[in-house]
Amino acid sequence: MGLEVKLDASKLESWASQLSARGMRNAIRRAVDKSASAARKVALDIIAKDAGVSVARIKPGVTKLRRTTQTDLSASFTATKLRIGILETKGASVGAGGLRASTHRLTGGGSASLNIANAFVVRMANGARFVAFRKSKSRLPIKGVYAEMPSTAMGQDRAAARVAWQKEAEKQLAQRLPQEVQKQLLSEGLPYSPPADTGE
């Protein structure tokens, strides 16, 4: 997910005219990086809740923030197709009656029961395990049951995590950009005059 936000920059125009081009770019970079980092944390929390697992379990499926550069003022991260076993979700269990679990959806229809009567646990030689069920009466093939992937949680239109990311990014950048421009003005030894209070 890349940081693309809209904000009213008219109050910054007089400051920007006083700053060096490099100084202004550095101020923007700091504001974007900090805003994107804060928004990513919010997105991680929503993705975890959407899948019904802990944030720690989701983190390996979300890349670290790709920060801005002198030639690229965008910041982004990627939600991957990390597979998380259904048994790692809250309340999931496999017993004589098969799998009893829930889908934890903040997007769309919300949470729902997920019951598979003929599900069983497969234990691997390395100690790993996953829930599976047979697709037919034959011994093979079997199909694994997994929680929602991070890429799904972020990729859907109007996904809760995507909406939260965008909202937080916009709020953070609106706050941080004026602060970083002010810092840059002071570092360049230029006088700082706050914008007029319009009552907004």
Annotated model-derived regions:
Residues M1-E200:
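Short, Lys/Arg-rich flexible segments
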